[in-house]
A protein has these predicted regions:
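Conserved short alpha-helical segments that host acidic/polar catalytic motifs at enzyme active sites
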Residues: 1-212, 217-276, 282, 370
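A conserved beta-strand->alpha-helix junction
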Residues: 55, 124, 129, 301-312, ...
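Flexible loop/turn segments at secondary-structure boundaries
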Residues: 76-77, 107, 177-178, 199-201, ...
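Secondary-structure transition/capping motifs at alpha-helix termini
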Residues: 120, 141, 273-276, 295-302, ...
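Amphipathic alpha-helical
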Residues: 130-141, 283, 295-313
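PRPP-dependent phosphoribosyltransferase catalytic core
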Residues: 166, 203-209, 361-445
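Extended, hydrophobic alpha-helical segments in both membrane/secreted and soluble proteins
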Residues: 279, 286-293, 297, 301, ...
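Short, glycine/charge-rich flexible loops or terminal/linker lids adjacent to PRPP-binding catalytic cores
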Residues: 298-344, 354, 381-391
């Protein structure tokens, strides 16, 4: 899972891209980068670390231009090295090009092997580089046609921004697995970003979502853009965006992430009634669902677990050893609130079980008498291959254990999940979603 942003025909584009990336830091913490186009020349700065670690005022001042694309990296393909930061910039027959990508290509190894057999030399471990090579090795006269031809050869989930010396292309796969939205900046320029929370920070107005299978073409110096439906749309936005990844203040496909998460809590409360003194969220991602649960159940809401906000997300850390330590560093329950109490604990998901087990242990040590664990999504039973880092069945506790076995493992007094139908009800039944982590329907093959 990554964040991408494009700033088109706007003064100080790099600085605007920087702020947009900062607002989407939750989507990737391993690396960050920005490419700008100035007078037909593309310059790129990128590196490992948070947005604020990679960029400073001096760097941003050097990135001059009114066209920019940017990226926050969360590794799903490749390793966490400086080489694998995006954007990827290259020179080819039609000039300079830079590209950023959010998603995952399921046929990346097959495509890479074919390209290497044909003489291609790869500089990174990223599947994104496949697209650069496919574009460069095509002989069509126009970049637009080369991009479309390249996308015909890849399979997977992707949102792409491709920058040339004179144009920027925004593309979303036919399923629209990953979100991508279009907005208008105050100076008349455009912004394209993974989440609408970026629009709020930079003062942009939301226009619409980039449609599944759509390519939007922006030209340097022109106020209008061109919309092309390059693939037949088969919409299936990823349900996990609503459950966990997106910021609660974002809107995806017309749905407020915050309101969807509250609805998940309400549905949970209706299906799993239990007597308790408090409803306690696992912060921060469990808070909206806990509010919904408390509202529906009439059980008081308590922020009885304090989160250290200077510790990153446990789910997207590369090593299990680091995750174990970070749970303790990140969460601290309040004994003064919890001692002798029966509580309902709400979390957005159980992936590996690491965090849930630690949370229950911490709550027991804080004096909680009964712990009823409620999860605002179904059991994660299948690896997600479209941009979320769950590469094997072995890492998914619900792939190997029943609900009762998971309950026993994490040490809770009771455990309930939303069903798939209840998840659909919470988001809205009017469209299809990517539910591959829950139902194993790998619709991109």
């Amino acid at each position: 899972m990554c964040a991408i942003v494009g700033i088109i025909n706007s003064k100080d584009a790099a600085k605007t891209a920087y702020y947009a990336l900062f607002s989407m830091q939750h989507r990737g913490q391993e690396a960050s980068g920005i490419s700008v186009c100035n007078d037909g020349e593309i310059s790129t700065h990128k590196g490992n670390g948070l947005v604020t670690e990679v960029f400073n005022e001096k760097v941003l001042s050097s990135l001059k231009g009114d066209m920019a694309i940017g990226h926050n990296r969360y590794a799903t393909a490749g390793k966490n090295s400086g080489r694998d930061a995006q954007p990827i910039a290259a020179n080819y027959a039609l000039g300079q090009i830079s590209i950023v990508h959010n998603g995952n290509l399921v046929n990346k190894d097959e495509v890479r092997d074919e390209l290497i057999k044909d003489g291609a030399i790869f500089q990174t471990n990223m599947d994104t580089e496949n697209i650069i090579h496919l574009i460069a090795r095509n002989h069509d006269e126009h970049l637009q046609d080369r991009i479309i031809a390249a996308l015909d050869k890849i399979k997977g989930a992707y949102c792409l921004l491709v920058q040339s010396r004179h144009k920027t292309f925004a593309i979303r796969d036919r399923w629209g697995v990953r979100p991508l939205s279009l907005g208008r900046l105050k100076d008349g320029g455009y912004i394209v970003a993974s989440e609408t929370c970026a629009f709020d920070l930079v003062g942009a107005t939301f226009m619409r979502d980039v449609r599944p299978g759509e390519m939007i073409v922006f030209e340097h110096g022109k106020n209008e853009f061109q919309s092309l439906q390059i693939f037949e749309p088969e919409p299936r936005v990823c349900a996990f965006e609503y459950i966990y990844f997106a910021r609660p203040d974002s809107v995806i496909e017309g749905k407020s992430v915050y309101e969807v998460r509250k609805k998940m809590g309400e549905v949970l409360a209706k299906k799993s009634k239990v007597k308790a003194d408090f409803v306690v969220p696992v912060p921060d991602s469990g808070v909206p669902a806990a509010l919904g649960y408390a509202n529906e159940s009439k059980i008081p809401f308590e922020l009885a677990i304090t989160r250290n906000h200077y510790v990153g997300r446990t789910f997207i850390e590369p090593s299990q050893e680091m995750r174990n330590l970070k749970v303790k560093l990140k969460l601290n329950p309040m004994s003064s609130v919890l001692a002798g109490k029966s509580i309902v604990v709400i979390d957005d998901s159980i992936v590996r079980g690491t965090t849930s087990k630690k949370v229950v242990d911490l709550l027991r040590h804080a004096g909680a008498k009964e712990i009823h664990f409620r999860v605002a999504c179904p059991e994660l039973k299948y690896p997600e291959r479209y941009g979320i880092d769950t590469p094997s069945f072995e890492e998914l506790i619900s792939a190997k254990k029943s609900v009762e076995e998971v309950r026993e493992y994490i040490g809770a007094d009771s455990l309930e999940f939303l069903s798939i139908d209840e998840l659909k009800e919470s988001i809205g039944n009017e469209r299809k979603y990517s539910l591959v982590s829950f139902d194993g329907d790998y619709f991109i093959k």
